[in-house]
Amino acid sequence: MKLRDGIYMARCKEKNALSAAANGHSLVYPQARCTVKRDMAIFDRDGKEVWRCNAGYAELHFVLEKI
């Protein structure tokens, strides 16, 4: 299923910060806001972009809840 454009709360699937860092998700751990637009997922904290990836990767590696 393709992730639709919108704003989500993204939660890392990793159980701890070390696992998140090993997978390159430390800037998102434990959660961050995620804006999906035109197949790009942009993660931010306090209005500052911290990471980005394609929407398919985000859907596979994070728990995303529409907000």
Segment roles from a protein language model:
Residues 19-52:
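Basic/aromatic-rich interaction segments and small domains that mediate binding to polyanionic partners
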Residues 9-18:
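Generic short beta-strand segments
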Residues 4-6:
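A glycine-anchored, Pro-Gly-centered beta-turn/N-cap motif
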Residues 48-67:
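Intrinsically disordered, low-complexity, charged/polar segments
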